[in-house]
Amino acid sequence: MTPLFHLENIVRTYPDPASRDPHAVRTVLNLSELDIRAGKILGSRGHNGSGKSTLLRIIALLEPPDSGTVLFEGRPAGTDDLHLRRQVTLLLQTPYLLSRSVASNVAYGLRVRGIRNASELQNRIAASLLAVGLDPAVFLHRRRHELSGGECQRVALAARLALRPRVLLMDEPTASVDQQSAERIALAARHAADSGSAVVVVSHDHEWITPLSDRLVTLREGKLVE
């Protein structure tokens, strides 16, 4: 079966701030091959600077590699493909929420996508909050300042789940959350995969990411190690 994403011979470099040579670069990602499949959770671990976040940005089509091939369902994928970018969503380590109600935050992306039907909005908001373990009856009208850090991250994840993405990317999603939120985030990621999404999670938390992942890889100095 053709993977959703296929990455091959991916190289990404950035200017080297430690060098006096203005043309000097450092290689942050040197990836031979990686497949991302629907219905599976790919876990990636590694230390800071190992290339984990860069890998996610390339998969999210937010930045291109210097060289290499990125295919989506066998077709070339680039940062200018807005239709494809809408099928991929990225959850960051530090959630950004609007200073509005939880309902407004979850609905924001749906409205941007053109969903205006009140019943559909209500159903999607409620379902996504339940998926991250937040009772809509309790949290729907709460505002950002009334939420804990873990609850903010779960609302941010709910907003992405409401979009029903084909690819869900999560960058250190449990780095600043409590144990209960970490467990709920893991359950939500598994539910997304079981519903058909491809899920890619990067984390330095070995104990959290290992049981969650269908496949676990390690990035070391930009290179993939099983």
Per-region residue spans from a language model:
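The feature captures the beta-strand-to-loop junction immediately N-terminal to the Walker
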Residues: R45-H47
